[in-house]
């Protein structure tokens, strides 16, 4: 028996679609929806489109397909840069993207603005997730929220004392030679600069993603020192390997997501985690529709589905993210008691010191023409050099 059942909202929306003419294009904001096209091609983060094949109790794809007739074809992106390239290929109707991709997609015209009046579940989304820099442009929504979470610090409680700050990754890294676990992405440079915000305030860093040359050089120097201690790496495709490494005792401390922590706790592994007192980087992911979408009606139906209590509740429990509405929280609690408290879904103050992934820009993402920052190409080049050293 499937855990999830199609909602009355979805049924109502489909009836409305049948009464409307085919929109025919995903290039501009839609004024109305037409008949579902029968197919939906998505770029996703791993775990964002589960059909019950991995765990029968987690299935929000099959009910969507049964109710709408839109057959979901999902392709996993390894990282945000790959996701951007995939959507730009024109082969996908949309996808789930983090802030370090959404700003590029909006700026490049690769995604279309979203008519949220056509999405019945949008009104219920927490206000703190709406009209944010990572999902809106000039006050116009370019997507709908999926979930959010911090990049946590985790450690093996048998080997490491309780942590409150990131110092274990930086100043104390020599204590964990060969057993550090780090996120393998240029975006990890922001974790270094966030630590410098707290420990070297004279650098004047005010945004860990927008760094002038001196600030950037300081972050790279910190990483160069850290890399001398032979860290191990994981990314959006290999986070399961981090679970295995923690469970086996091959790593003792590192950055992680709630998903890995929950998986390890379920195995009774000696693991604990914290949002460091300096704050943390993190993500707030968004479902967006391609400006070249071949199946825009199915994409709109999917975006609305992913804000429903059942689908969002399941998806955020599955990945250890904060649900996007009170209704989704209530559903999440019914299948995973304590989930919304654990993920701070309704505690907006918790997110005040979480810096969602964003793209480094030459103009420093501000209105001061006198400031110049190292752009993302510079971050990629530096990270490639670091990883090759």
Residue spans for each PLM region:
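Periplasmic-binding protein-like
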Residues: 120-125, 149, 220-226, 267-291
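A ligand-binding cleft/hinge motif common to bilobed small-molecule-binding domains
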Residues: 101-106, 254-270
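Early extracytoplasmic/lumenal segment of secretory-pathway proteins
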Residues: 20, 27-105
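Paired acidic/hydrophobic, glycine-rich loop segments that form the ligand-binding mouth/hinge
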Residues: 93-97, 235, 252-257, 272-273
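Mature extracytoplasmic/periplasmic domains
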Residues: 285, 290-357
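Conserved C-terminal helix/tail region of periplasmic/extracytoplasmic solute-binding proteins
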Residues: 351-389
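C-terminal motif of bacterial Sec signal peptides marking the signal peptidase cleavage site
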Residues: 15-19
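Extracytoplasmic ligand-binding site segments that recognize negatively charged/polar headgroups
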Residues: 43-56, 96-245
């Amino acid at each position: 028996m499937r855990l999830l059942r199609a909602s009355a909202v979805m049924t109502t929306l489909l009836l409305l679609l049948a009464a409307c003419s085919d929109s025919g294009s995903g290039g501009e904001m839609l004024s109305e929806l037409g008949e579902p096209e029968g197919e939906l091609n998505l770029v996703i983060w791993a775990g964002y489109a589960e059909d019950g094949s991995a765990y029968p109790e987690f299935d929000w794809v099959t009910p969507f397909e049964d109710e709408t007739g839109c057959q979901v074809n999902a392709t996993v992106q390894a990282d945000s840069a790959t996701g951007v390239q995939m959507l730009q290929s024109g082969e996908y109707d949309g996808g789930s993207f983090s802030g370090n991709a959404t700003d590029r997609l909006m700026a490049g015209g690769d995604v279309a603005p979203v008519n949220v009046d056509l999405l019945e579940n949008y009104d219920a989304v927490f206000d703190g997730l709406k009209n944010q820099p990572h999902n809106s442009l000039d006050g116009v929504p370019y997507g709908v929220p999926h979930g959010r979470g911090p990049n946590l610090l985790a450690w093996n409680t048998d080997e490491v004392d309780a942590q409150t700050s990131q110092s274990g990754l930086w100043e104390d890294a020599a204590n964990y030679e060969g057993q550090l676990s780090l996120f393998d992405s240029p975006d990890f440079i922001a974790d270094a600069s966030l630590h410098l915000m707290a420990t070297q305030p004279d650098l004047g860093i005010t945004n860990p993603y927008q760094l002038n040359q001196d600030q950037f050089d300081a972050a790279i120097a910190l990483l160069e020192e850290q890399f001398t201690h032979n860290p191990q790496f994981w990314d959006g495709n290999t986070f399961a390997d981090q679970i295995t490494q923690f469970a086996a005792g091959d790593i003792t401390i590192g950055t992680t997501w709630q998903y890995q922590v929950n998986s390890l706790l379920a195995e009774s592994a000696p693991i604990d985690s914290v949002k460091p007192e300096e704050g943390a980087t993190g993500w707030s992911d968004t479902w967006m529709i391609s400006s070249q979408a071949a199946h825009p009606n199915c994409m709109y139906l999917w975006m609305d589905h992913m804000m429903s209590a059942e689908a969002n509740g399941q998806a955020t429990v599955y990945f250890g993210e904060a649900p996007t509405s009170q209704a989704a929280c209530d559903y999440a609690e019914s299948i995973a008691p304590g989930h919304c408290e654990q993920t701070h879904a309704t505690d907006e103050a918790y997110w005040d010191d979480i810096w969602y992934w964003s793209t480094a820009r030459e103009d420093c993402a501000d209105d001061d023409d006198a400031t110049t920052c190292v752009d993302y190409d510079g971050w990629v080049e530096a990270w490639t050099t670091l990883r090759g050293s």
